[in-house]
Regions:
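An amphipathic alpha-helical interaction segment
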Residues: 1-14, 30, 35-38, 42-44
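Terminal helix-turn-helix DNA-binding modules in bacterial transcription factors
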Residues: 13-21, 26-30, 49-89, 110-138
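Core residues of bacterial helix-turn-helix
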Residues: 35-36, 85-86, 97
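Short hydrophobic/aromatic patch on the recognition helix
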Residues: 42-43, 47, 92-93, 97
Length: 138
């Protein structure tokens, strides 16, 4: 999500890569800015200009996207998924997930579980193997 069609600053690319790799860890704005050798104010300004989102909103969206992926694994409990995605509170996770997706995590899982089950079944039955697609879980 880049604004104005400008090339993304290396600082922002590094910050986004760090967030992607550490979304489950507590990530502080001051910590990120310091690691980029800039003030918190400057980092916030540049991050918002580049992504169109505040640092906190961007981090929340990354965590919700990770949670959406994890919700496809029907063996994981929603509470475990919340913590795996980086949320410190199940209540906060539920509230934010609903605000960003329009539905609660359980409903999201239910609405998408048929797709997840079909993919799992097709991999187990070898239906994708004939098309050159193999399961990485095997």
């Amino acid at each position: 999500m880049q604004q104005d069609g400008q090339a993304e600053e290396p600082m922002i690319r590094r910050a986004k890569a760090y967030i992607a790799g550490h979304h489950a860890d507590p990530i502080g704005l001051d910590e990120i800015a310091r690691s980029m050798h800039v003030s918190t104010f400057y980092f916030c300004k540049m991050f918002k200009k580049s992504t169109g989102l505040t640092f906190t909103d961007y981090l929340s969206r990354v965590r919700v996207e990770k949670a959406k992926d994890l919700l496809m694994n029907l063996r994981l409990r929603v509470s475990d998924i919340a913590y795996m995605a980086g949320f410190q509170s199940l209540t906060h996770f539920n509230r934010l997930f609903r605000r960003l997706t329009g539905e609660c995590p359980t409903r999201f899982r239910d609405n998408n579980s048929n797709r997840a089950n079909a993919l799992e079944t097709n991999f187990k039955d070898g239906r994708f193997a004939s098309k050159g697609i193999v399961s990485l879980a095997a």
